[in-house]
Amino acid sequence: MAAGKEIRGKIKSVENTKKITKAMEMVAASKMRKAQERMLAARPYSEKIRNIAVHLGQANPEYVHPFMQVNGDAKTAGVIVVTTDKGLCGGMNTNVLRAVTAKLRELQDQGVSAEAVAIGNKGLGFLNRVGAKVVSHATGLGDTPHLEKLIGPVKVLLDAYAAGKLSAVYLSYTKFINTMKQESVVEQLLPLSSESMQAEKTSGHSWDYIYEPDAQSVIDELLVRYAESLVYQAVAENMASEQSARMVAMKAATDNAGNVISELKLVYNKTRQAAITTELSEIVAGAAAV
């Protein structure tokens, strides 16, 4: 029964793997709820500050911030790539990196080079493998992202855009839709999107502001907060998507392990039955010979 012993060993191995994937599924479910709470808490702030920034872009303030201006002469664009630090989350990272690759090719076709900021180990490794120019990165964010860890690397691109060195800054991440669905997106962070401005105009809301103490100090602070909040929201969305994708992936792995165990047990029983039948046949044949 050497074959039976080998099958029993495989069954034991798959059962141990099933215990691990089940535990990871439960941990991911717990982290997912916390990540969703953080994401949903931050979403109203990021949406409101985006609306205010768009209002400023379509108004006629006495001071125009560099983030509102189009750097037409620049031949370099910035791309912020948000991925996970760890794997085992299905095709989530693959999908967002595929979207980033499409954007890089689009920029290349336009004669525009790219400088990247990687947030997450998976994106950093990918960008290094494809030979992209990575000017800064942030990894090891843990389960709770902190803005102070994010803004340093991102500020490299923001300062470059303000200095007129970049034509645009794009933000790529995985947007959380629901537990079973996440969407890879590449959004324009800078300059303020003309599509967003047009949407605000068609919605019928268009106004200017009175600035105190002066327009420059208010707008400078506000648009920096705008960029920071959108990057933080992207990371929060990405983390919620990560835990959801990992929970689903681990559940699928647990279910598959159960199916493999059932199939192995069936093979084991058939092998054992065949061995017993062979032994009985030999005994009967021996008795008949006597």
Swiss-Prot record:
Subcellular location per UniProt equals: Cell inner membrane
Question: InterPro entries recorded for this chain?
Answer: ATP_synth_F1_ATPase_gsu, ATP_synth_F1_gsu, ATP_synth_F1_gsu_CS
UniProt-recorded Gene Ontology molecular function terms? ATP binding; proton-transporting ATP synthase activity, rotational mechanism
What Pfam families has UniProt attached to this entry? ATP-synt (PF00231)
Q: Its Gene Ontology biological processes?
A: proton motive force-driven plasma membrane ATP synthesis
Could you tell me the keywords of this UniProt record? ATP synthesis, Cell inner membrane, Cell membrane, CF(1), Hydrogen ion transport, Ion transport, Membrane, Transport
Q: How does it sit in the membrane?
A: Peripheral membrane protein
Listed under GO cellular component are: plasma membrane; proton-transporting ATP synthase complex
The record's section on SUPFAM superfamilies has:
ATP synthase (F1-ATPase), gamma subunit
Query: Is RNA-binding tagged as a keyword?
Result: no
Query: NCBIfam families under this entry?
Result: ATPsyn_F1gamma, PRK05621.1-1
Stated role: Produces ATP from ADP in the presence of a proton gradient across the membrane. The gamma chain is believed to be important in regulating ATPase activity and the flow of protons through the CF(0) complex.
Record's subunit section: F-type ATPases have 2 components, CF(1) - the catalytic core - and CF(0) - the membrane proton channel. CF(1) has five subunits: alpha(3), beta(3), gamma(1), delta(1), epsilon(1). CF(0) has three main subunits: a, b and c.
**Record's family?**
Belongs to the ATPase gamma chain family.
Name of this chain's protein: ATP synthase gamma chain
The scientific name of the source species is Delftia acidovorans (strain DSM 14801 / SPH-1)
Q: Which gene encodes it?
A: atpG
